[in-house]
Design a protein with these regions (language model features):
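Conserved beta-strand-loop surface patch within small alpha/beta domains used
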Residues: 1-82, 91-138
């Protein structure tokens, strides 16, 4: 019997992502509090409105250093409302590294990078291909 490897291609579906203001504030304060280390967490959407990011989930065992955040993804809860990741950069550039892009491709549909000085204008969002996307604050 011959088994062929299934070609993993994602269908690009347009989602108008939104993030709750208080969730973004929590991300900002979390990034500030752990500086100069990187902050990292998972993004979770509302149960009823699947395009609104409403909270973050801290993974047990996450390693946060000055140049990296290592997620222990085997500790991720079984939760279909987890849609991506958030992590901070101690530099002023919210641009994904090669390691970030690898994570984006493997886990989640939307990802946020917040950069120093950690405020409402120092973050960017990306899809799983590393393409910048817009997220509305609600």
């Amino acid at each position: 019997m011959l088994f062929l490897k299934k070609n993993k291609t994602r269908q690009h579906t347009k989602v108008n992502w939104k993030i709750k203001h208080n969730c973004l504030d929590l991300i900002i304060e979390s990034a500030k509090s752990i500086y100069p280390n990187e902050f990292g967490a998972l993004l979770r959407v509302d149960d009823q409105q699947k395009s609104i990011i409403s909270e973050i989930i801290l993974l047990p065992g996450t390693v946060q250093g000055e140049t990296h955040t290592i997620f222990k993804l085997h500790m991720m809860p079984i939760d279909f409302n987890i849609v991506g990741t958030i992590h901070s950069h101690p530099s002023p550039f919210p641009i994904p590294s090669d390691a970030d892009l690898e994570l984006f491709r493997k886990h989640g549909r939307v990802h946020i990078i917040i950069a120093n000085p950690y405020n409402h204008s120092s973050w960017k969002a990306y899809d799983y291909n590393g393409e910048e996307i817009k997220i509305e604050i609600v």
